[in-house]
Amino acid sequence: MSQATDFTVRAADGSTVPLSQWAGQVILAVNTASKCGFTPQYEGLEALWRRYQDKGLVILGFPCNQFANQEPGDAAEIASFCSLTYDVTFPVLARIEVNGPGADPLYTWMTDASRGLLGTRAVKWNFTKFLIGRDGKVIRRCGPGVKPEALQADIEEALAEG
């Protein structure tokens, strides 16, 4: 697989979601958690979604329980939390693993394409962000300390390239 849109992921209801449906759009993929110090970033992600979705931005939330068990809920609990607490309307998909032998293939591809600090592949923590351009290639990887609004200029640049 050579670009993000070659992959298929799972929706919260277990159905398959081909990323090809967003071919030609800019994608921001984020591993999320409901009980994390970075959880308030849902608010910034939703703000980006509302501002840029009509211009070609897709935000995909990937719940993950690999970091200190901070996403223990089932799909219904996660959806309810996101909706009621942060009024999230961007797609929040099925819970996945982002590291190790059980890692979702999309995350294996993204971490190979864009390494972290000191060249590491592993996702460091919840709310690591991967910005993917209209060509399906990873543009930027950001750690959890980078707030969603800090990506605005990169998003605007990526949206302009198409």
Question: What kind of region is each of these model predictions?
Answer:
Residues 1-162:
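Chalcogenol-based redox active-site neighborhoods
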